[in-house]
Protein backbone atom coordinates (compact mmCIF):
# COMPACT_ATOMS: atom_id res chain seq x y z
CA UNK A 1 0.00 0.00 0.00
CA UNK A 2 2.86 2.36 0.83
CA UNK A 3 4.50 1.61 -2.51
CA UNK A 4 1.28 2.29 -4.40
CA UNK A 5 0.79 5.68 -2.78
CA UNK A 6 4.43 6.59 -3.33
CA UNK A 7 4.20 5.63 -7.01
CA UNK A 8 1.18 7.91 -7.35
CA UNK A 9 2.98 10.76 -5.58
CA UNK A 10 5.95 10.23 -7.88
CA UNK A 11 3.70 10.52 -10.92
CA UNK A 12 2.24 13.81 -9.74
CA UNK A 13 5.71 15.16 -8.98
CA UNK A 14 7.14 14.14 -12.35
CA UNK A 15 4.28 15.83 -14.21
CA UNK A 16 5.11 19.04 -12.34
CA UNK A 17 8.91 18.86 -12.62
CA UNK A 18 9.17 21.48 -15.35
CA UNK A 19 6.87 24.01 -13.74
CA UNK A 20 9.29 25.81 -11.40
CA UNK A 21 9.09 28.99 -13.49
CA UNK A 22 5.31 28.93 -13.42
CA UNK A 23 5.40 28.59 -9.63
CA UNK A 24 7.52 31.72 -9.32
CA UNK A 25 5.21 33.56 -11.71
CA UNK A 26 2.18 32.44 -9.70
CA UNK A 27 3.77 33.86 -6.53
CA UNK A 28 4.51 37.17 -8.23
CA UNK A 29 1.01 37.38 -9.69
CA UNK A 30 -0.51 36.64 -6.28
CA UNK A 31 1.60 39.28 -4.56
CA UNK A 32 0.71 41.86 -7.20
CA UNK A 33 -3.01 41.12 -6.96
CA UNK A 34 -3.13 41.03 -3.17
CA UNK A 35 -0.46 43.46 -1.98
CA UNK A 36 -0.10 45.89 -4.92
CA UNK A 37 -3.42 45.71 -6.79
CA UNK A 38 -3.16 49.24 -8.21
CA UNK A 39 0.61 49.40 -8.35
CA UNK A 40 0.72 50.75 -4.80
CA UNK A 41 1.37 48.79 -1.62
CA UNK A 42 -1.65 48.27 0.62
CA UNK A 43 -1.64 47.23 4.30
CA UNK A 44 -1.91 43.48 3.71
CA UNK A 45 0.86 41.15 4.80
CA UNK A 46 1.85 37.61 3.89
CA UNK A 47 4.30 34.97 5.12
CA UNK A 48 6.10 32.82 2.55
CA UNK A 49 7.43 29.57 4.03
CA UNK A 50 10.17 27.45 2.49
CA UNK A 51 11.58 24.22 3.84
CA UNK A 52 15.06 24.65 2.42
CA UNK A 53 17.51 27.54 2.58
CA UNK A 54 18.30 27.13 -1.13
CA UNK A 55 14.64 27.71 -2.01
CA UNK A 56 14.60 30.65 0.38
CA UNK A 57 17.54 32.23 -1.45
CA UNK A 58 16.03 31.46 -4.87
CA UNK A 59 12.67 33.09 -4.17
CA UNK A 60 14.35 36.03 -2.41
CA UNK A 61 16.28 36.83 -5.58
CA UNK A 62 13.10 36.62 -7.65
CA UNK A 63 11.13 38.84 -5.28
CA UNK A 64 13.89 41.44 -5.07
CA UNK A 65 14.26 41.59 -8.86
CA UNK A 66 10.52 42.10 -9.40
CA UNK A 67 9.88 45.01 -7.06
CA UNK A 68 9.04 43.02 -3.92
CA UNK A 69 12.30 43.55 -2.03
CA UNK A 70 13.90 46.33 -0.06
CA UNK A 71 12.12 47.53 3.05
CA UNK A 72 8.97 45.62 2.06
CA UNK A 73 10.65 42.21 2.41
CA UNK A 74 11.90 40.72 5.68
CA UNK A 75 13.64 37.38 6.20
CA UNK A 76 13.76 34.80 8.98
CA UNK A 77 15.99 31.75 8.68
CA UNK A 78 18.17 29.49 10.78
CA UNK A 79 21.28 31.51 10.03
CA UNK A 80 20.03 34.44 12.10
CA UNK A 81 20.78 34.76 15.79
CA UNK A 82 17.95 35.24 18.26
CA UNK A 83 19.10 38.82 18.71
CA UNK A 84 18.80 39.44 14.96
CA UNK A 85 15.39 37.80 14.72
CA UNK A 86 13.66 39.90 17.35
CA UNK A 87 13.57 43.23 15.45
CA UNK A 88 12.38 41.41 12.32
CA UNK A 89 9.49 39.81 14.20
CA UNK A 90 8.69 43.12 15.86
CA UNK A 91 8.55 44.91 12.51
CA UNK A 92 6.20 42.29 11.08
CA UNK A 93 3.95 42.41 14.13
CA UNK A 94 3.82 46.22 14.18
CA UNK A 95 1.01 48.18 12.56
CA UNK A 96 1.38 48.60 8.77
CA UNK A 97 1.27 52.35 9.39
CA UNK A 98 4.38 52.06 11.54
CA UNK A 99 6.35 49.40 9.63
CA UNK A 100 6.81 49.09 5.84
CA UNK A 101 7.31 45.31 5.91
CA UNK A 102 4.64 43.47 3.92
CA UNK A 103 6.30 40.13 3.09
CA UNK A 104 8.05 37.79 5.51
CA UNK A 105 10.14 35.11 3.83
CA UNK A 106 10.80 32.38 6.38
CA UNK A 107 12.22 28.90 6.71
CA UNK A 108 10.96 26.44 9.31
CA UNK A 109 13.27 28.10 11.84
CA UNK A 110 10.36 30.55 12.24
CA UNK A 111 7.54 28.01 12.25
CA UNK A 112 7.38 27.12 15.91
CA UNK A 113 6.61 29.24 18.95
CA UNK A 114 6.47 32.60 17.18
CA UNK A 115 3.43 34.88 17.08
CA UNK A 116 2.95 36.63 13.74
CA UNK A 117 -0.82 37.11 13.65
CA UNK A 118 -1.22 40.78 14.64
CA UNK A 119 -1.57 42.14 11.12
CA UNK A 120 -1.27 39.06 8.90
CA UNK A 121 -3.85 36.45 7.88
CA UNK A 122 -2.22 35.17 4.68
CA UNK A 123 0.39 32.43 4.38
CA UNK A 124 1.96 30.65 1.40
CA UNK A 125 3.74 27.28 1.54
CA UNK A 126 6.33 27.28 -1.23
CA UNK A 127 7.29 23.73 -0.26
CA UNK A 128 5.11 21.13 1.39
CA UNK A 129 6.99 19.43 4.24
CA UNK A 130 6.86 15.64 4.56
CA UNK A 131 5.69 15.85 8.15
CA UNK A 132 2.16 17.34 8.31
CA UNK A 133 2.92 18.59 11.82
CA UNK A 134 5.44 21.03 10.35
CA UNK A 135 2.75 22.49 8.12
CA UNK A 136 0.43 22.84 11.10
CA UNK A 137 3.19 24.65 13.00
CA UNK A 138 3.60 27.07 10.11
CA UNK A 139 -0.13 27.72 9.88
CA UNK A 140 -0.20 28.25 13.63
CA UNK A 141 1.94 31.37 13.31
CA UNK A 142 -1.16 33.25 12.13
CA UNK A 143 -4.04 30.85 12.82
CA UNK A 144 -4.04 31.40 16.57
CA UNK A 145 -5.59 33.38 19.40
CA UNK A 146 -5.26 37.07 18.68
CA UNK A 147 -5.95 36.81 14.95
CA UNK A 148 -8.19 39.77 14.13
CA UNK A 149 -9.51 38.65 10.75
CA UNK A 150 -12.44 36.28 10.24
CA UNK A 151 -10.53 34.21 7.69
CA UNK A 152 -6.98 32.87 7.55
CA UNK A 153 -5.91 32.25 3.95
CA UNK A 154 -3.42 29.45 3.24
CA UNK A 155 -2.04 28.71 -0.23
CA UNK A 156 0.15 25.86 -1.55
CA UNK A 157 1.27 27.01 -5.05
CA UNK A 158 3.33 23.91 -5.84
CA UNK A 159 2.52 23.89 -9.54
CA UNK A 160 1.88 27.55 -10.10
CA UNK A 161 -1.87 27.01 -10.26
CA UNK A 162 -4.44 29.48 -9.07
CA UNK A 163 -4.86 30.18 -5.37
CA UNK A 164 -8.11 28.26 -5.28
CA UNK A 165 -6.59 24.97 -6.35
CA UNK A 166 -2.82 25.13 -6.30
CA UNK A 167 -1.15 21.77 -6.16
CA UNK A 168 1.39 19.46 -7.74
CA UNK A 169 -0.27 18.77 -11.06
CA UNK A 170 -3.60 19.72 -9.49
CA UNK A 171 -3.30 17.12 -6.73
CA UNK A 172 -2.28 19.17 -3.68
CA UNK A 173 -5.09 17.94 -1.44
CA UNK A 174 -4.51 14.35 -2.56
CA UNK A 175 -0.84 14.70 -1.68
CA UNK A 176 -1.64 16.03 1.77
CA UNK A 177 -4.07 13.17 2.39
CA UNK A 178 -1.47 10.64 1.26
CA UNK A 179 1.18 12.20 3.47
CA UNK A 180 -1.13 12.14 6.47
CA UNK A 181 -1.93 8.49 5.80
CA UNK A 182 1.77 7.65 5.60
CA UNK A 183 2.32 9.53 8.85
CA UNK A 184 -0.52 7.54 10.41
CA UNK A 185 1.10 4.32 9.20
CA UNK A 186 4.33 5.36 10.84
CA UNK A 187 2.49 5.96 14.10
CA UNK A 188 0.64 2.62 13.91
CA UNK A 189 3.52 0.48 12.65
CA UNK A 190 6.39 2.24 14.33
CA UNK A 191 7.90 3.45 11.06
CA UNK A 192 7.46 3.91 7.36
CA UNK A 193 10.07 2.20 5.20
CA UNK A 194 13.31 3.93 6.34
CA UNK A 195 14.67 3.99 2.78
CA UNK A 196 11.54 5.46 1.22
CA UNK A 197 10.59 7.98 3.90
CA UNK A 198 13.54 10.40 3.46
CA UNK A 199 12.83 10.57 -0.28
CA UNK A 200 9.29 11.88 0.11
CA UNK A 201 10.09 15.60 -0.01
CA UNK A 202 12.18 15.13 -3.13
CA UNK A 203 9.39 13.30 -4.89
CA UNK A 204 6.82 15.90 -3.95
CA UNK A 205 8.97 18.82 -5.07
CA UNK A 206 10.09 16.97 -8.21
CA UNK A 207 13.81 16.93 -7.40
CA UNK A 208 13.78 13.12 -7.50
CA UNK A 209 12.68 11.22 -10.61
CA UNK A 210 12.24 7.84 -8.97
CA UNK A 211 12.31 5.99 -5.69
CA UNK A 212 15.36 4.04 -4.61
CA UNK A 213 13.94 1.07 -2.70
CA UNK A 214 17.16 -0.86 -2.30
Where are these regions (language model features)?
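Conserved Helicase C-terminal RecA-like lobe
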Residues: 1-102
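Conserved nucleotide-binding/hydrolysis micro-motifs of P-loop NTPases
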Residues: 53-56, 80-82, 109-112, 128-132, ...
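Short, surface-exposed basic-aromatic patches at helix termini and helix-loop junctions that form
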Residues: 62-68, 121-122, 144-147
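SF2 helicase motor core recognition
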Residues: 104-120, 139-147
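A short beta-strand element within the Helicase C-terminal
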Residues: 114-128, 152-156
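Conserved SF2 helicase motif VI
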Residues: 131-154
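C-terminal accessory region of SF2 helicases/translocases
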Residues: 149-214
Amino acid sequence: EQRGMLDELRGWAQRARNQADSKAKAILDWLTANLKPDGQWNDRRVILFTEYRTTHQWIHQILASHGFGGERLAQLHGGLSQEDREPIKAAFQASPQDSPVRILLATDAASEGIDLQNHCNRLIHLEIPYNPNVMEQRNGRIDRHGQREKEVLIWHPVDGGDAGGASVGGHGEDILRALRKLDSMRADMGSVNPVIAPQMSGLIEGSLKDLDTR
